[in-house]
């Protein structure tokens, strides 16, 4: 009866910490509703281990059970009178702490192993070499004469940066007694810092150095072909500098080499491209073609002679491949004539048949054969000074850029008809191709002698032949080389040498003194700022050769010059090779304002523009 009455009088309230029961007198106004209690009860999963989720013990069935429940065990009450956590809760906390410890240990161990692997990769895997040396200069001593200044760029050590190859005549004091021709030296300098990679002795002065891959495929090694001024033709391994083969001079007993070697398609079907050299007779103007194997250096047949009538500079030889695939050799004396490679091969082999690749003909070219059906094809005959191959836009063939004494002419390669002609005089140096206008057609920078100690630079539009930029500047160096480099936005920067622009007004007619000034400046012209020239560098010597190479990894270009210092009687001129990073020079160069522009160009705007320039390989070949 007492038990029933106790249950009937039980009211909801807060649980007393001492008795574990709800006390209606201490019950405050609770914020929780009855629904919240029900939800909490469902969320906690109901009664577990004999206790309700609200902490309320099951109701006893007798007064004894009530009395027993009112006596808390010592294990459930702390010294402060509050109940301690159950033993199962301590075990769960211990297990949770162990799991956290294991997870932390695994994470730290994984992080440590990853850091060790990163450090190992950083030390073991070589990073691509960075061109840290923005500029260097190498003194190669004194050269003992020589009229030619061959210079070539090629990557010989596989570091992704083109190296510098050049040849020079050594001092005559060091040549052997009884040698009629002074020996020369072939040197390869590192493009990174100018150190000597290798050097080889040459029996005579070198006329030309050409480095290329004669075998198709990505694994082909680079070969450097060196043509001498007399009878030397040798192939060198570009990596080691060792001679692979040398043409026997006896095959040129009746003449000497007249021009650099020319690379041909594979004629003897041995998987290596072959060569042709042009020799000229000692006493008569007979020209002789000799086909040479690119693999062994032995002749591919006998010499083939042609009698040429003409007066002037020797032109070529150069190889021209038409749209249909016909192969012709261009050459001449003051004129341009062509002969099919098929005809040379048939005569050299003394047979009537030729490889299928040589049997292709170009109808428009064949129409120009002489009336007597001669093997020679007349291309151009009007005082020719220079001949260049220029890639035609949107075509796989090239046009012919011809420099004469009176004009500059562009011939269409497909039918040999004039595209345009520009009449001018005084042009003695080779036109420099590049992109100046926005029509993606190659334009040309010209250097024309314009009075004593003055020269005129002009840019000719390759599509129309009109002059789109010109400037007159002092310069006493004869035939100073000009170059160009292509940027990623299909524009070109043009580089040329002149004296300080403050030496004379660009439009003045003042004639400077005949004494040449001692300082020459390297100027850069960008088509986006035609009224500004950038002064990049200067030298007191005479620049005899220059080349531009591209660093593909860093999108930079570098400018290599070959310079000879002033010579005096009994003291040969010093030879200096220098390299200049163009992106570095653009930031350090001085701005020279040619004329006022609207709006006025600030130096900050110019520097921001120049800092975004990136250089790429030229898509054309000359």
UniProtKB/Swiss-Prot annotation:
Mind naming one GO cellular-component term on file for this protein?
Golgi apparatus
Phosphothreonine is found on 26
Region named Disordered: 1-68
Membrane topology of this protein: Single-pass membrane protein
Q: Which UniProt keywords apply?
A: Cytoplasm, Cytoskeleton, Golgi apparatus, Membrane, Phosphoprotein, Transmembrane, Transmembrane helix
Has UniProt tagged this entry with the keyword Transmembrane? yes
* Compartments it resides in: Membrane; Golgi outpost; Cytoplasm, Cytoskeleton, Microtubule organizing center
Q: Which stretch is the leader sequence?
A: none
PTM-bearing positions, type Phosphoserine: 16, 30, 33, 62
Q: Indicate yes or no for the key word Phosphoprotein.
A: yes
Question: Where exactly are the transmembrane stretches of this chain?
Answer: 104-124
Query: What PANTHER family does UniProt report for this protein, alphabetically?
Result: PROTEIN FAM234B (PTHR21419:SF25), PTHR21419
Indicate the family of this protein: Belongs to the FAM234 family.
Task: From the Swiss-Prot or TrEMBL record, give the protein name.
Answer: Protein FAM234B
Q: Which organism is it from?
A: Homo sapiens (Human)
* Gene behind this protein: FAM234B
């Amino acid at each position: 009866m007492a038990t029933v009455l106790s249950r009937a009088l039980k009211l909801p309230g807060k649980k007393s910490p001492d008795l574990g029961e709800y006390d209606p007198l201490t019950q405050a106004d609770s914020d929780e509703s009855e629904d919240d209690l029900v939800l909490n009860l469902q969320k906690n999963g109901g009664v577990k281990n004999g206790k309700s989720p609200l902490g309320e013990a099951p109701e006893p069935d007798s007064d004894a059970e009530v009395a027993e429940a009112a006596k808390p065990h010592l294990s459930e009450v702390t010294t402060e009178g509050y109940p301690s956590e159950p033993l199962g809760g301590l075990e769960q906390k211990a297990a949770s702490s162990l799991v956290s410890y294991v997870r932390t240990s695994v994470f730290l161990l994984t992080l440590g192993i990853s850091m060790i692997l990163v450090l190992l990769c950083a030390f073991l895997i070589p990073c691509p070499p960075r061109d840290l040396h923005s500029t260097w200069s190498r003194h190669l001593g004194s050269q003992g004469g020589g009229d030619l200044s061959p210079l070539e760029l090629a990557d010989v050590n596989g570091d992704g940066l083109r190296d510098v190859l050049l040849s020079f005549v050594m001092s005559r004091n060091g040549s052997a007694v009884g040698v009629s021709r002074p020996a020369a030296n072939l040197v390869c300098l590192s493009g990174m810092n100018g150190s000597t990679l290798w050097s080889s002795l040459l029996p005579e002065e070198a006329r030309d150095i050409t480095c290329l891959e004669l075998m198709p495929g990505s694994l082909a090694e680079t070969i450097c072909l060196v043509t001498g001024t007399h009878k030397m033709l040798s192939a060198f391994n570009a990596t080691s500098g060792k001679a692979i083969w040398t043409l026997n001079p006896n095959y040129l007993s009746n003449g000497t080499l007249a021009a650099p070697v020319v690379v041909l398609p594979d004629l003897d079907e041995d998987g290596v491209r072959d060569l042709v050299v042009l020799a000229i007779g000692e006493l008569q103007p007979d020209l002789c073609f000799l086909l040479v194997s690119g693999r062994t250096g032995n002749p591919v047949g006998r010499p083939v002679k042609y009698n040429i009538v003409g007066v002037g500079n020797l032109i070529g030889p150069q190889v021209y491949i038409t749209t249909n695939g016909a192969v012709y050799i261009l050459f001449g004396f003051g004129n341009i004539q062509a002969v099919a490679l098929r005809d040379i091969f048939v005569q050299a082999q003394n047979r009537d048949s030729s490889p299928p690749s040589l049997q292709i003909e170009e109808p428009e070219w064949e129409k120009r054969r002489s009336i007597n059906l001669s093997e020679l094809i007349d291309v151009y005959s009007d005082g020719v000074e220079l001949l260049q191959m220029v890639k035609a836009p949107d075509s796989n063939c090239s046009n012919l850029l011809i420099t004469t004494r009176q004009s500059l002419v562009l011939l269409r390669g497909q039918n040999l008809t004039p595209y345009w002609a520009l009449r001018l005089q005084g042009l003695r140096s080779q036109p420099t191709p590049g992109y100046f206008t926005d029509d993606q057609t190659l334009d040309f920078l010209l250097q024309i002698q314009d009075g004593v100690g003055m020269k005129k630079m002009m840019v000719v539009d390759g599509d129309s032949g009109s002059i789109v930029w010109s400037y007159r500047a002092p310069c006493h160096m004869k035939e100073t080389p000009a170059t160009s480099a292509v940027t990623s936005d299909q524009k070109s920067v043009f580089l040329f040498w002149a004296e300080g622009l403050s030496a004379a007004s660009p439009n003045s007619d003042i004639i400077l003194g005949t004494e040449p000034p001692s300082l020459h400046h390297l100027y850069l012209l960008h088509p986006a700022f035609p009224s500004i020239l950038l002064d990049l560098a200067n030298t007191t010597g005479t620049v005899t050769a220059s080349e531009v190479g591209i660093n593909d990894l860093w999108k930079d270009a570098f400018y290599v010059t070959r310079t000879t210092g002033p010579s005096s009687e009994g003291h040969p001129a010093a030879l200096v090779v220098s390299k200049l990073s163009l992106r570095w020079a653009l930031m350090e160069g001085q701005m020279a304002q040619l004329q006022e522009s609207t709006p006025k160009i600030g130096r900050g705007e110019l520097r921001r523009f120049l800092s975004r320039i990136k250089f790429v390989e030229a898509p054309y070949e000359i």
